[in-house]
């Protein structure tokens, strides 16, 4: 779906649509979608908005302030800054009601693998990120080594300096 054609985006939503996913700077054209308008469409349909802010970086753009519910980043690129470590970031804005729509039983219904917990009741606005921590990380074992964590931390500490230099050079 062309993110610049808001009517097309609205028309593409079906009963089985789970979320609206977009990038702050689209790959490969670096196009910039109207996140506020797309978020309004998603809210009209009761859908969460997931924004990949890898190229926007948290230093330059904060999608949650523009209606995103979840923001993801590839930490390998600008956050790490050196391409030395693989990593990712998930930010849950706590703005979406996961129980209301009935589309996400894995969060809103009892989870038998986690003592019957309903993440929407146990974690409230943090239900999604709590599910990620409790279930997804448990099941996939996704974790980074201490050295890679150190490298990503170094990149984070210099993010503002590097992005300011990028901006000066544009």
Model-based region annotation:
Residues 1-170:
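Conserved PLP-enzyme active-site core in the AAT-like
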């Amino acid at each position: 779906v062309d993110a610049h054609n808001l009517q097309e985006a609205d028309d593409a939503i079906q009963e089985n649509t789970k979320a609206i996913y977009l990038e702050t700077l689209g790959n490969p054209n670096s196009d910039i979608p109207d996140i506020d308008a797309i978020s309004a469409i998603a809210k009209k349909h009761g859908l969460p908005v997931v924004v990949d802010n890898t190229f926007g970086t948290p230093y330059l753009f904060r999608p949650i302030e523009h209606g995103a519910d979840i923001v993801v980043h590839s930490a390998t690129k600008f956050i790490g800054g050196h391409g030395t470590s693989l990593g990712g970031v998930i930010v849950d804005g706590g703005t979406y009601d996961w129980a209301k729509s009935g589309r996400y039983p894995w969060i809103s219904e009892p989870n038998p693998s986690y003592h019957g917990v309903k993440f929407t009741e146990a974690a409230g606005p943090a239900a999604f990120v709590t599910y990620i921590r409790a279930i997804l990380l448990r099941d996939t074992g996704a974790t980074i080594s201490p050295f890679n964590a150190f490298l990503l931390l170094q990149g984070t500490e210099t993010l503002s300096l590097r992005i300011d230099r990028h901006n000066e050079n544009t």
